[in-house]
């Protein structure tokens, strides 16, 4: 074996091969982390820009549910329902539950809080038959997995930036066609407070049967001769208005949560990149030092053998 061949054997030692494999793995992982960090930064900027318009629409949609709420005396109706001792005539013991979730993830605990609230309501209330509908894909699987017999439908196409009131009405018509005689409805969504804060909110909407408990207050208003039909229409309109408001409130909360989540992910990515960079440089320096030592040792051994 000549001198060059002996030197190649030294450089191709198992220790050097292991070091090269470690460096390659570190380099691949470092590149992956940097790529993901770029993606999270982009998502943060997108969520930040969308939050402005979502916040504006959430504020504008708020008053839509205030008027019907005052007319129907929802607070008094809810109290009467909770404290009623006499059987309610034609009561169906059916409550509609509408959970507003998102179509996409990476938005913190927004969907988890809604699903947790829905499951708690389904487990705790044994007096009523609660039927659940959802908007957004993220709420379907967790609810269907635990309560398949109580799930009605999922409303799609509500994850986009804008949607019309008729779209909300079509979704509600589909629900009401399946459960025409319901006692009450509950819309559960994330109420937007600011860019760093939101909380789960519940909007109670009485059905026609429960409105009868508060009919004296309602009859103070001048209506058409068919007051029962008017009350039913107002109840359904209030349900649509509450869902309309909840959708925009939830979207603003989604954008705020995604902005915070992606900002935290970007910061974590930078920390991991720095740590991997230091680890890579140390491993590379150690490999170079080891190779130099082996080269010098190999050269000395070759000279001695010659």
UniProtKB/Swiss-Prot annotation:
Protein topology in the membrane: Peripheral membrane protein
GO biological process: proton motive force-driven ATP synthesis
The organelle targeting sequence, given as a residue range: 1-17
Key words of the record: ATP synthesis, CF(1), Hydrogen ion transport, Ion transport, Membrane, Mitochondrion, Mitochondrion inner membrane, Transit peptide, Transport
GO molecular function (one): proton-transporting ATP synthase activity, rotational mechanism
SUPFAM superfamilies: ATP synthase (F1-ATPase), gamma subunit (SSF52943)
Major localisation: mitochondrion
Subcellular location(s) of the protein: Mitochondrion inner membrane
GO cellular component: mitochondrial inner membrane; phagocytic vesicle; proton-transporting ATP synthase complex
Alphabetized Pfam families for the sequence: ATP-synt
Ion transport among keywords: yes
Gene3D superfamilies cross-referenced by the UniProt entry: 3.40.1380.10, ATP synthase, gamma subunit, helix hairpin domain
Family: Belongs to the ATPase gamma chain family.
PANTHER family in alphabetical order: ATP SYNTHASE GAMMA CHAIN (PTHR11693), ATP SYNTHASE SUBUNIT GAMMA, MITOCHONDRIAL (PTHR11693:SF22)
NCBIfam families assigned: ATPsyn_F1gamma
Role noted for this protein: Subunit gamma, of the mitochondrial membrane ATP synthase complex (F(1)F(0) ATP synthase or Complex V) that produces ATP from ADP in the presence of a proton gradient across the membrane which is generated by electron transport complexes of the respiratory chain. ATP synthase complex consist of a soluble F(1) head domain - the catalytic core - and a membrane F(1) domain - the membrane proton channel. These two domains are linked by a central stalk rotating inside the F(1) region and a stationary peripheral stalk.
Record text on subunit structure and interactions: Component of the ATP synthase complex composed at least of ATP5F1A/subunit alpha, ATP5F1B/subunit beta, ATP5MC1/subunit c (homooctomer), MT-ATP6/subunit a, MT-ATP8/subunit 8, ATP5ME/subunit e, ATP5MF/subunit f, ATP5MG/subunit g, ATP5MK/subunit k, ATP5MJ/subunit j, ATP5F1C/subunit gamma, ATP5F1D/subunit delta, ATP5F1E/subunit epsilon, ATP5PF/subunit F6, ATP5PB/subunit b, ATP5PD/subunit d, ATP5PO/subunit OSCP.
Protein name as annotated: ATP synthase F(1) complex subunit gamma, mitochondrial
Annotated organism of origin: Dictyostelium discoideum (Social amoeba)
Gene: atp5f1c
């Amino acid at each position: 074996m000549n001198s060059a061949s002996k030197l190649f054997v030294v450089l191709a030692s198992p220790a050097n091969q292991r070091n090269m494999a470690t460096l390659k793995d570190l380099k691949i992982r470092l590149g992956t982390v940097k790529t993901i960090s770029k993606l999270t930064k982009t998502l943060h900027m997108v969520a930040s820009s969308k939050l402005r318009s979502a916040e504006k629409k959430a504020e504008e949609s708020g008053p839509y549910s205030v008027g019907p709420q005052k007319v129907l005396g929802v607070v008094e109706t809810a109290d009467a329902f909770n404290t009623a001792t006499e059987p309610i005539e034609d009561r169906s013991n059916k409550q509609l539950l509408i959970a507003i979730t998102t179509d996409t993830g990476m938005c913190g605990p927004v969907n988890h809080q809604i699903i947790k609230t829905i499951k708690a309501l389904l487990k705790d209330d044994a007096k009523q038959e609660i039927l659940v509908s959802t908007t957004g894909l993220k709420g379907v699987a967790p609810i269907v997995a635990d309560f398949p017999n109580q799930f009605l439908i999922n409303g799609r196409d509500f994850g986009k930036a804008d949607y019309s009131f008729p779209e909300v009405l079509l979704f509600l018509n589909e629900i009401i066609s399946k459960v025409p005689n319901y006692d009450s409805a509950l819309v559960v969504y994330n109420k937007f407070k600011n860019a760093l804060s939101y909380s789960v909110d519940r909007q109670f909407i009485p059905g026609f049967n429960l409105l009868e408990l508060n009919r004296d207050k309602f009859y103070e208003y001048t209506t058409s001769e068919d007051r029962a039909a008017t009350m039913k229409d107002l109840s359904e309109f209030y349900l649509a208005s509450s869902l309309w408001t909840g959708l925009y409130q939830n979207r603003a909360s989604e954008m705020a949560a995604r902005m915070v989540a992606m900002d935290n992910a970007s910061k974590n990515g930078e920390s991991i990149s720095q740590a991997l960079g230091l680890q890579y440089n140390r491993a590379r320096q150690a490999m170079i030092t080891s190779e130099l030592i082996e080269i010098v040792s190999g050269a000395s051994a070759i000279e001695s053998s010659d």
